[in-house]
Structures are given as C-alpha cells and as structure tokens.
C-alpha cells in the first residue's frame, strides 16, 4: 500500500539554455513535497515536513515480500522485481497538486535546504553515481552540456576534476560555459587533428553521430560511458570499437555505497543532500523562473 500523501505548490522552470527535451515538460522525480497525511502511525511525526522523491527501495514501496538484493542495498533504481509492481489509480503524477508515495520512495529534506534548492537532490545524486565510474580514468571527454552534466561537474572532487574536459563545439556551448563558470573545456577545433587523446568518453547526449565523431580520439582499451539517450537506437562504429577493444557501458540513475563502520548502505541521495546542505556547489543559476501551481495550465 502507498502510505503517504504529499502536496506540491510551486513548479520551477529549468534554465532553457540547458533544456534538450522536445515537447511538454512533466514533473518526474525532481520533486520536493510536504507530507500532509500518512497511514503509518510511526511516521505521523513527519507530517508537515518536506521530502524529496527517490527510488530507494521499490520492493518495500510496492509490498513485494521477497526483497531483492538491489533494494536491500538502497538501489531501488535497479530493483529486480519491477515487473511485480501493481500500480493504483490514485497515485498521480504529472502536474498533480497532491500525490501518493511510499515512505520508501522518499527522503526527508533538512530545514536548512530551501525547497527550490532541494529539487536538485536527485540530479546531483546522478552525477555522484557517474563519478563513481571514473576514478581510475586518466583523461575524460565529456559530451553534452546539460543540467545533469553541469551538476556532475560541480560535484567532482579535485582528483577527477583535473582529468575532465567538456567538449565545446558551438558558440552557444562556449557562452554557457562562460556564464556558468565552467573552466575545464576543450574546443572541437583543438582536438579535430589529434588522435588517441582520451581514455574515456562520458556521454550525456546520446547521439550516435556525435559519439562516432570522437571514437578516434580514444586510446586502445578505452571506455565509453553512456548517460544520455537522445537516439532510440544507437548505431556506433563497431569496427573502431572492436579493433581498439573499446568497451561501452550505460550509466543510469543513482546507487549507494557500503559504510563499513556504520554497517549500512548510504544512498547517493543522502550524499547529495549533504553536498547541498554544506553549500559546496551552486545551483541557483540553473533555475530561470518559479511558477505557482495554480498558474499551470495543461
């Protein structure tokens, strides 16, 4: 059973310079909501508090008795029992003012974090997960300047930051990087005549042609990590991949890490909240407007 009702009263519009989505925007998980009711007696103490919505434990959220290994590790994004989920017609989503979620799909937001800042908890957690794959890489080319990729960049530690470069292809890319204070950039013209420059591509765009354009910039035995999904079916240069033993791997959502001293799994959502609470990264410049819920028209 779903056990919590939450209320949303403001929508924030993303900075349009970073928006690659075609068509209408609908609320996904990037939500901060207030708890207004719950059937869980123990959880009633949290009525009035704010939460972020995240897939932490799908098995418990949908009352699936045999909890999968991923949900036990707070990796609900990779739940092995997703096909067993049964949805009810009163959960709602989109631009709903009220919707129902399980407590296992939420994480309490500290009072110190403003709601408009809290909407970045989940996107930052995606960046944290991306960085997890890059610790051993020596020189990384980032393709695609977007909200997620910028949050990823801003949350990087010094060791990875020194190895990461955003690809700048257009004047628009250049202006965005300048406006958002992104210093780790490499211009398309500079690397066009170079070969085997990078050992990793982190792609936030998902375009076959764009990835193929830069395959020659990779050293043998390099890696391509795909985060973006613009092309429904990627068509990569398999000859180049095979002849240079280049591996391709997808990255999706957020994950967790095991804390040996505390004997528990700490989700990337929790790490993201700590980053925002500390003021380590700036996010205000990624919001262009705030819209009242009552002013939204379908």
Each language-model region and where it sits:
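Short, well-ordered coil/turn residues at beta-beta hairpins
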Residues: 54, 202-204
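Mid-domain Rossmann-like dinucleotide-binding core that forms the NAD(H)/NADP(H) cofactor-binding site
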Residues: 104, 111-189
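A short acidic, Gly/Pro-enriched loop at the edge of an enzyme's catalytic core
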Residues: 193-201
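ADP-ribose/adenylate-binding Rossmann-like module
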Residues: 217-234, 248-249
